[in-house]
């Protein structure tokens, strides 16, 4: 079906960039099957009382927005106007929870080989700015029991 569509309209049917498929269900929207499976695993751990305060898609500010002042020349006077020079940079963690009083931040990746340069920088900034080390989850077979 996709090949026929592509030939009829002379376009390429796009696949997900890293081969993941979004999951939408009663629990919410997840970027991959791995992320949804990890959510089920962690929510069971929370019900058993092993972890607490499980949260999804938590945003951490890494670099605040940068503002500057530009002088506007009006007919009667000059006026300084605040303008945005650079947008803020933030990291959105897949999962954040607490175990034994320690905050744990996790990010699900399909493979340890599909880690982008942006993620590497944001992971280092998380450690530097918030003193939190991001744990990479790549395969269900390596999850702790």
Feature map (PLM): residue ranges:
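Electrostatic, structured charged patches in enzyme active sites and in nucleic-acid/phosphate-binding
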Residues: 1-145
């Amino acid at each position: 079906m996709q090949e026929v569509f592509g030939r009829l309209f002379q376009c390429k049917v796009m696949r997900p960039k890293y081969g993941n498929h979004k999951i939408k269900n009663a629990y919410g929207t997840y970027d991959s099957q791995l992320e949804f499976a990890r959510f089920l695993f962690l929510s069971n751990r929370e019900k058993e009382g092993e972890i607490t305060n499980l949260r999804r898609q938590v945003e951490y500010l890494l670099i605040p927005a940068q503002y500057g002042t530009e002088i506007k020349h009006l007919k009667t006077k000059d006026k300084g106007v605040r303008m945005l020079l650079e947008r803020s940079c933030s990291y959105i963690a897949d999962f954040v929870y607490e175990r034994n009083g320690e905050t744990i931040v996790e990010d699900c990746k399909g493979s340890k080989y599909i880690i982008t340069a942006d993620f590497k920088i944001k992971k280092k900034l998380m450690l530097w700015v918030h003193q939190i080390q991001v744990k990479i989850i790549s395969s269900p077979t390596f999850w702790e029991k």
